[in-house]
Amino acid sequence: MPKYRSATTTHGRNMAGARALWRATGVKDEDFGKPIIAVVNSFTQFVPGHVHLKDLGQLVAREIEAAGGIAKEFNTIAVDDGIAMGHGGMLYSLPSRELIADSVEYMVNAHCADAMVCISNCDKITPGMLMASMRLNIPVIFVSGGPMEAGKTKLSDQIIKLDLVDAMIQGADPKVSDEQSEQIERSACPTCGSCSGMFTANSMNCLTEALGLSQPGNGSLLATHADRKQLFISAGQRIVELTKRYYEQDDESALPRNIATKAAFENAMALDIAMGGSTNTVLHLLAAAQEGEVDFDMTDIDRMSRMVPHLCKVAPSTQKYHMEDVHRAGGVVGILGELNRAGLLHNQSKTVLGLTWEEQLAQYDIMLTDSEEVKRFYRAGPAGIRTTQAFSQDCRWDTLDDDRAQGCIRTKENAFSQDGGLAVLKGNIALDGCIVKTAGVDESILKFTGPAVVFESQEDAVEGILGGKVKAGDVVVIRYEGPKGGPGMQEMLYPTTYLKSMGLGKACALLTDGRFSGGTSGLSIGHASPEAANGGAIGLVKQGDLIAIDIPNRTISLQVSDQEMAERRAEQDALGWKPVSRQREVSFALKAYASMATSADKGAVRDKSKLEG
């Protein structure tokens, strides 16, 4: 029978000092012996996805204590990628994932906590907490802050839905008037919550459901909706049940590594491909798998990308559907239900509810259940009122979207495409692979060949695109922006956005060893591995070289002979693998990150071999 970790600090005369300090935090005599459960919050006033979380940690804490635990809350940092984007701040985004994972480990291990509730939401916070959960392997439940309502505005006598990316595109389009640009800016992000499309934050919150580590609705139920309060209440109650199952009943099925198994990671990846999730999720799933010693890598992702169809199309791949529409169609459970009916789900994997996915689908899939309570839950909708308050409205759709032929979520037979929403491409320019969000690629450019226009940084690329150096038919190459080369693997949302604003969104390709925002669409290929700074062939591309992209056949190649490539490599070895004449201030903290960073095909995690021996 495992011993409560917290007993180290709460039992024995030699722990009198620790107990004295616990008492000073409010622990009473009768509490010693109860499980100590960390409430890992991420409240900050910098991020709309986290601005409403301040009181939610204590909401969870009260439920933990009512159920027989001791709740202790702490906070992690949280970077807003949208605000950090387009300047030096973006260098810090991906490295913050490692800091979050480490800070959770530090706090939980330093104080011998027995279990965790992770209150996450935005881009690097959920992955960082997920990495920590797999690393620590103590009972955990995730509950996110929830998605933002979609923005709405009236243009040309039509009400259209909006999100952050619309504001960015319109702001950079010289043909759009200042008045219209400001109108869209003011309407794009109306409430608290993670940005309203299937961007990185919402993708990751959906994936925690598929991994089995969060409750139904976690990925899709709006931040503003009153129903979301119950997810926080239930998380506080369930974590005590999970904790006692493990420590008092020796039930190891309550541990995250026994919930988020390889089968669960494959379920999460199947969901990601089916819903056309952010390419960043590939990085984060690979990183979390390594933390949990799960045998899941790019080979698995490539295999699955060839099997799973695109069943759910959401912004930025369409303007028609946002996260509120996904929820109305049954949320993550609805998509997993269709994957199950297509034979593409490991339905015996378990979840934090203690159910197999087969059992959970029977209860929560709107296409199967008879429960009016469940159907009412999935009719939770937007109010259209600007607010930063959680649980502030109780609006509902009149009907569910159960149209699996032409609705937001579709059957395999009626899929948006039989080819999934993400693909792994390989070739001489990316021997270890690169990633493209096929859900956002127009069918006319699934095969594309063009001359390279090479930039050594995102800043130069932005200047070049806006300055007219890129024309229709070109392949924009942005290199030395990987985890080590950036450092920090910046998101390339501004270059892709400006290509659209210049009318080149369907006429150009972009290849980078950096990454993309979940808001990116178009023929945008990222994570080229190895990255240029690690000797990757993307560092050998010269201006005008032809690059051939073939998504259906999963290939990408530099049309240069092997002999020429070898000569260029020898030349680059002598010069050193670094950008030419790039002016960029890199802090000591970022240099420390770069010194241990691996390429994207490894999840951009730290190179553990550098700590051995």
UniProtKB/Swiss-Prot annotation:
Pathway stated in the Swiss-Prot or TrEMBL entry: Amino-acid biosynthesis; L-isoleucine biosynthesis; L-isoleucine from 2-oxobutanoate: step 3/4; Amino-acid biosynthesis; L-valine biosynthesis; L-valine from pyruvate: step 3/4
Entry GO terms, CC: cytosol
GO biological process: isoleucine biosynthetic process; L-valine biosynthetic process
Cofactor: [2Fe-2S] cluster; Mg(2+)
GO MF term (any one): 2 iron, 2 sulfur cluster binding
Record keyword Iron-sulfur present: yes
Residues annotated to bind Mg(2+): D81, D123, K124, E491
Residues that bear N6-carboxylysine: K124
Similarity section: Belongs to the IlvD/Edd family.
Function description: Functions in the biosynthesis of branched-chain amino acids. Catalyzes the dehydration of (2R,3R)-2,3-dihydroxy-3-methylpentanoate (2,3-dihydroxy-3-methylvalerate) into 2-oxo-3-methylpentanoate (2-oxo-3-methylvalerate) and of (2R)-2,3-dihydroxy-3-methylbutanoate (2,3-dihydroxyisovalerate) into 2-oxo-3-methylbutanoate (2-oxoisovalerate), the penultimate precursor to L-isoleucine and L-valine, respectively.
Name of this chain's protein: Dihydroxy-acid dehydratase
Source species of the chain: Vibrio vulnificus (strain CMCP6)
